[in-house]
């Protein structure tokens, strides 16, 4: 469906940040609204790339995820997103993205996380070694439990993904509600996506490839 752009739109904000406003922009977006997979950040970064602007500070002023989207390379992020460590040569992963089409407030997820958090002195996982898949498996999403508390259907999504043949990892993206599954090959991811669409036809489900070539 068509949406009217206003001053809060990331595309308009990006044009203003690099002093290229006004422009006529036609944006075709094939993602659910507020999917939690960086769609708005990617839009802002795309505007900056069109005008050959690679300013980290300008990108960061638009959002913590915009710098990594600007360079569009496999990377680990530090700080609030301004410290990027690129990870070349890790290859690609076949993935399935699934969104149950529920609305989930990022602020509410973080609030729920804060209320659940208990300092236990545990050491953060190491995600700087091994293949792209190993790094993903060794990592974690601390917001997952909080999001499931607010929207239990996210737990259902993860279970459905995890039950698909060839699934190596199922996890929530960011603060949700979109979840992803990593699969051993393109055939497995395609079969999984078709199966998930049959199980839950109301969910948004797409295959994709993550990582650099």
PLM features: residue spans?
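DPxDG-like acidic metal-binding loop motif
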Residues: 35-62, 68
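Conserved, helical-rich catalytic subdomain that frames metal- and/or nucleotide-binding sites
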Residues: 71-72, 76-169, 184-190, 194-202, ...
